[in-house]
């Protein structure tokens, strides 16, 4: 059994009502419930965390290093394009992570096309809606298998 962490960045608490054109109508609670169930079925423990403040997300990442977290799935949301501090926190704890985005950031405004995380992530999934989280979780399961 592995301990896994899903981190959701700013404004993702508004899923279900926020710009459904880009983010769909599913709620964050529904995404978290689905992921938690899938992880439990695979024999893993999954914790989901959301915050709108950068420093709170950083503190969560720092504490992951002391909680035996084997893998992180993160949707940094708007911090993708702005937060060197969040990137540095992920690099500092050296826990492998997959970057997820609900919308296809490459089909949106130009400023959304740059990520401070992609080059240090194990992988990036963008534009597949909530299915992107599920695919990231499946990739995590595959990486946790013994060689």
Curated annotation (Swiss-Prot):
InterPro entries: DHquinase_II, DHquinase_II_CS, DHquinase_II_sf. Substrate binds at residues 75, 81, 88, 102-103, 112. It catalyses: 3-dehydroquinate = 3-dehydroshikimate + H2O. The record marks 18 as: Transition state stabilizer. Its EC number is 4.2.1.10. Homododecamer. Belongs to the type-II 3-dehydroquinase family. This is 3-dehydroquinate dehydratase. It comes from Nitrosococcus oceani (strain ATCC 19707 / BCRC 17464 / JCM 30415 / NCIMB 11848 / C-107).
């Amino acid at each position: 059994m592995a301990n896994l962490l899903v981190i959701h960045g700013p404004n993702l608490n508004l899923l279900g009502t926020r710009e459904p054109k880009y983010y769909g109508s599913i709620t964050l609670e529904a995404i978290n419930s689905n992921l938690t169930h899938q992880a439990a079925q695979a024999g893993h423990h999954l914790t989901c965390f959301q915050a709108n403040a950068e420093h709170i997300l950083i503190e969560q990442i720092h504490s992951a290093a002391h909680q035996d977290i084997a893998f992180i799935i993160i949707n940094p949301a708007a911090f993708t394009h702005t937060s060197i501090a969040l990137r540095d926190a992920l690099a500092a704890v050296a826990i492998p992570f997959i970057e997820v985005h609900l919308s296809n950031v490459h089909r949106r405004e130009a400023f959304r096309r740059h990520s401070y995380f992609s080059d240090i992530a194990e992988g990036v999934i963008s534009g597949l809606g909530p299915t992107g989280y599920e695919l990231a979780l499946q990739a995590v399961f595959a990486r946790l298998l013994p060689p």
